[in-house]
Amino acid sequence: MGDRVILHSDINSCYASIELLHHPELRGKPVAVGGDPEARHGIVLTADYVAKKHGVKTGMALWQARQVCPDITFVPPRMDLYLRFSKMAHEIYGEYTDLQEPYGIDESWLDVTASASIKGDGYKIAHEISNRMKSELGITVSVGVSFNKIFAKLGSDYKKPDAITTMYKDEFQTKAWNLPASDLLYVGRSTDSKLRKMGIHTIGDIARADEKWLNSYLGKMGSILWAFANGYDTSPVRKENTSAPVKSIGNSTTTPRDLENDEDVKIVLYVLAESVAARLRENGFRCRTVEISIRDNELYSYTKQTKVTNATNITKEIADAGFRLFKQSYNWQKPIRSVGIRGADLVNDNYWEQLDLFHNAELKDKMMKMDAAVDDIRRRFGFYSIQRGLMLGDTILSAVNAKEEHTVHPHGYF
């Protein structure tokens, strides 16, 4: 049996590239996608290559980005727009294989083994996909071509932007083994620090090390990294039918004043939940888990999560689940400075599940219709054109920027 043909496609500077399509006047200038630069905790979500050359990095505070690149332009994130582009990219990928596994909004593994005999080898398919992404979507991708997922991802990271890199069996030692160990999937800062203390600096060092010795220091991750470095990854590209291309959609905000009671928190949770639920609906997702994050005015923070009975994208169900979590977990010894809520463990709208015995279908249908009506009004007249009655209790809190810190997170590898 021949080797598999696996591609890993990575949209270059995804958010920034999409924004530049809508802001052509910013091409050739340093641009970063992030929150309001006046906000207390805005960060860079992604930067274009001009900004990166000036030292701007993902995760950098906006004020830090301004320090290293005074001429930078900040563009607020529009996750619904990026998700639409992600769906269009997957439609292109789907013409080459139904075995595609998203890794966040901007990355995907594709198993094109079956179609390689018809459409040509992996490199040819990668080249065709790359050209179509440019001509049809106006964005570039870096594509890795290999016999497994790990080296395909290394290939897409090897050269950016707009590049195709092969990592075949007869060449991965030459191309991959000289790369830093931190380039290997799942070698984060902590693991990289441990490896350095062991005298391991490159992927080749991991490959040549004794597996049992790695295990003695890193536990089972030692064997996993050793197998990855030696090309022994046999994990399949998982066909995604009901899972969403991202694992969560969330929203958080640092409030304009400290929160001092349950009602304050409820108002903010509802504002944030409305944004999260609306984006779930816009992109055809439902969540099976609701998570909240709380930070007090002395910067102590925690997160709590709960499973919902049935997957949902209904605003009230998400907000109520979050508020129940909060009341169960917070003792009000200190005022609250920041609140977040996230819909996690996402599935597509076509996800089927058995309803529980006490499920009220009529009430759920009524809430869905109400959300749809609210969505329509807000599309036409703006987010704040219609609000819930509880938000009238504090117009300052109910006016927090519902889209300020909207975030999405990719699925893990395992």
What would you call each of these model-derived segments?
Residues M1-A227, E240, A278, K364-F414:
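Gly/Gly-Pro- and Ser/Thr-rich, intrinsically disordered tail segments characteristic of DNA damage-repair
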Residues H8, D183, T191-P335:
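DNA-contacting surface of Y-family translesion DNA polymerases
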Residues C14, P37-R40, N297-Y300, L346-D349:
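Short, charged/polar surface micro-motifs in flexible loops or helix N-caps
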Residues Y103-E107, S146-K149, F285-T289, K334-S338:
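Short Gly/Ser/Thr- and Asp/Glu-enriched loop/turn motifs at secondary-structure junctions
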Residues S108-A114, T303-T306, E353-H359:
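Short, hydrophobic beta-strand segments
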Residues F323-R380:
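C-terminal hydrophobic structural anchor segments
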